[in-house]
A protein has these predicted regions:
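Residue-level preference for long, well-ordered alpha-helices that form the structural scaffold
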Residues: 41, 45-48, 92-99, 131-134, ...
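Hydrophobic residues in well-ordered beta-strands that form the structural core
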Residues: 32, 63-65, 158, 188, ...
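Glycine-rich, proline-tolerant flexible connector loops at the mouths of alpha/beta enzymes
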Residues: 33-56, 122-129
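Histidine-acidic metal/acid-base catalytic patches
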Residues: 1-4, 11-26, 37, 50-53, ...
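Active-site loop/turn elements of alpha/beta-hydrolase fold enzymes
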Residues: 34-35, 68-71, 122-123, 161, ...
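Short, solvent-exposed beta-strand-terminating loops
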Residues: 64-76
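Conserved beta-strand positions in the central sheet of alpha/beta enzyme cores
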Residues: 31, 65-67, 119, 212-215, ...
Length: 283
């Protein structure tokens, strides 16, 4: 396994600048935020793509994931909070189609930068769109997306999160089975699993063949706030032993969007804390 860092901590930097900072610290991979102010809209023919490719080559970085979990760029004013609209489960067909088009663009971008996978979320159940209705909208959206992903040979990982339509590993596994695509899986955030007190060995065993990327951060007292590894309560020795047991071979991507005030420090502390786990052959 290899260690990556997400550019969503570097929202005061351009995407090429963020990749450079991550590369200079010694990470093997980088996750690209497909939202403002980075890869949005995620058009693979955009002028910035060549700059990104040059930075990846310069620092020998792979792309661990194209992160399409949020799409605040669709809205003219930032609220300062993550947004999941337009979502794939929205009651309005036109809104869903916006997100479907965006997701297909993520897939095209992944091809261009040699990423194996993208990540998305289910979205929330808004007023007038209860879960039993929203899930059908989500399934139909995913069927169209997965047809496109299969033709482009890109994996699609759904990231579940407390408060979303799909908010735990059991629900995600059921959704994967219903949609029926071999390229649909998980962008598994182990911090989220800690927040909702999931049994980690059971979770990893359930999803192991469908985990395309792992998000990692520390969590304190099961509160959903991403912390630098070592700053919370997660037992990383135990956690990495669980990951080792399923023979996971993908990226561990540190996700610390909560540190946009000092992303370089967050990335530096993270790699210093986590590197011994890799050097000691735990992973």
């Amino acid at each position: 396994m290899k260690l990556a860092f997400s550019t969503n901590a570097f929202t005061t930097y351009t995407l090429p600048e963020a990749i450079s900072e991550i590369g200079k610290l010694g990470y093997k991979g980088v996750e690209i935020l497909a939202d403002v102010p980075h890869a949005f809209p995620p058009v693979h023919t955009a002028a910035w793509v060549s700059d990104v490719q040059q930075k990846l080559e310069k620092y020998g970085l792979e792309v661990s994931n194209i992160n399409g979990n949020t799409a605040a760029g669709f809205f003219p004013y930032s609220t300062g909070e993550p947004t999941f609209e337009p979502s794939l489960c929205n009651a309005r067909e036109g809104v869903r189609n916006q997100r479907i088009k965006y997701t297909k663009q993520l897939i095209d971008l992944a091809v261009i930068v040699n990423a194996k996978n993208i990540s998305i979320t289910s979205g929330k159940c808004l007023s007038g769109n209860p879960p039993d209705q929203a899930i059908n909208h989500l399934i139909n959206s995913l069927i169209e997306i997965m047809d496109y992903a299969e033709r482009r040979e890109i994996n699609v990982g759904i990231e579940y999160e407390p408060g979303l339509l799909i908010e735990n590993g059991k629900e995600l596994n059921e959704l994967i089975q219903i949609v029926g695509s071999n390229r649909l899986g998980a962008n598994l955030d182990l911090g989220h699993a800690d927040v909702i007190r999931e049994d980690i060995p059971t979770l990893l065993s359930r999803l192991k063949s469908r985990i395309w990327n792992i998000h990692l951060e520390d969590i304190a007292d099961h509160k959903h706030y991403h912390l630098i590894p070592g700053h919370g309560n997660i037992d990383f020795n135990q956690l990495f032993n669980y990951v080792k047991q399923i023979k996971y071979k993908g990226f561990i991507t540190v996700e610390l969007y909560t540190y946009c005030n000092d992303p370089v420090l967050a990335a530096k502390e993270s790699i210093e804390f986590l590197t011994p786990y890799f050097k000691n052959s735990l992973l």
